[in-house]
Amino acid sequence: MPESDLEELPGVGPATAEKLRDNGFDAFQSLAVANSAELSNTADIGESTAADVIQAAREAADVGGFETGATVLERREQIGKLTWNIPEVDDLLGGGVETQSITEVYGEFGAGKSQVTHQLAVNVQLPTEYGGLHGRAVFIDSEDTFRPERIDDMVRGLSDETLQAAMEAHEIEGSTDDEDTLTELVDAFLDKIHVAKGFNSNHQMLLAEKAKEIASEHEDGDWPVRMLTVDSLTAHFRAEYVGRGELADRQQKLNKHLHDLEKVGNLYNAAVLVTNQVQSNPDAFFGDPTKPIGGNILGHKSTFRMYLRKSKNDKRIVKLVDAPNLADGEAVMRVQDEGLKPE
């Protein structure tokens, strides 16, 4: 939407509109999903005025009312599926990682969580006919896990046919056998991954707002943001809020953070991928005692929950633990130098 539209809302003059735009509220859709307290603080207006602005934005953007199931089905046809390039895992997910949803991948150290985030940051840039979304990725790195060298490995590890398609998508001419051409292609992939290191939970939450700005900036471009990754979602929250006395505060902040991530996914048709740490449940006498951090809040906010665990050598077991429309199941993949590969 044009920025000038904001001034058409009741209670929004030029000065207020400028404050809203400076804080990432540059379209009716972003205002429509805000809450009145957040908007009141951002624009320095009363909460009742903020509520009126939000309601007007919802009406203008046609957001927040009831819809028929047929309308919801039609809208869901716009949702993209991002491939893992592992048929077993893609089948498990009904075609791949969904846009407009939060997918949580949890597992112990070394299970391959960060490998998944790197591989999907590559795959999202592939043409849609090769399982990609022809989009860029935003990567919030809270554990210093992002390695451009790993992106290099994974791009070079694509099949020749996929490499050729990627070269066409990135408008690079040459042969897949030519080293200079491959280097140029790797650089093109890296240029479309926006990385920021989160130093603490507050900074991590701020970066989610910055991610929204990046998505807005590229919304109408040739390479829109189609994936937002947080690796790891819970590390800072777990370290900073210790003990039962601080659990409520931690969960409240985590809920706000997840809500912000969810908004980016919904507004910009992006897949939201978060990794999560685990802990052992000493009360579990049977089965796997490993459970994810984050409690019920993360459990409810994650549309898809996936559990990675180590197997022999480079094998990893990928288990779909929870999904609204899919049966639980398991698949096997390999973590190799060239990236994630089928068994």
Swiss-Prot record:
SUPFAM superfamilies, per the entry: P-loop containing nucleoside triphosphate hydrolases (SSF52540), Rad51 N-terminal domain-like (SSF47794)
Molecular function GO terms recorded: ATP binding; ATP hydrolysis activity; ATP-dependent DNA damage sensor activity; damaged DNA binding
Residues reported to bind ATP: G107, E108, F109, G110, A111, G112, K113, S114
Keyword ATP-binding appears in the UniProt entry: yes
Signal peptide extent: none
Keyword annotations of the record: ATP-binding, DNA damage, DNA recombination, DNA-binding, Nucleotide-binding
Pfam family of the protein (one): HHH_5
InterPro entries: AAA+_ATPase, DNA_recomb/repair_Rad51_C, DNA_recomb/repair_RadA, DNA_recomb/repair_RecA-like, DNA_repair_Rad51/TF_NusA_a-hlx, Hlx-hairpin-Hlx_DNA-bd_motif, P-loop_NTPase, RecA_ATP-bd
One of the GO biological process terms: DNA recombination
NCBIfam families, A to Z: PRK04301.1, recomb_radA
Protein task: Involved in DNA repair and in homologous recombination. Binds and assemble on single-stranded DNA to form a nucleoprotein filament. Hydrolyzes ATP in a ssDNA-dependent manner and promotes DNA strand exchange between homologous DNA molecules.
PANTHER family: MEIOTIC RECOMBINATION PROTEIN DMC1_LIM15 HOMOLOG (PTHR22942:SF30), RECA/RAD51/RADA DNA STRAND-PAIRING FAMILY MEMBER (PTHR22942)
Family: Belongs to the eukaryotic RecA-like protein family.
Name of the featured protein: DNA repair and recombination protein RadA
Source organism of this protein record: Halobacterium salinarum (strain ATCC 700922 / JCM 11081 / NRC-1) (Halobacterium halobium)
Name of the gene: radA
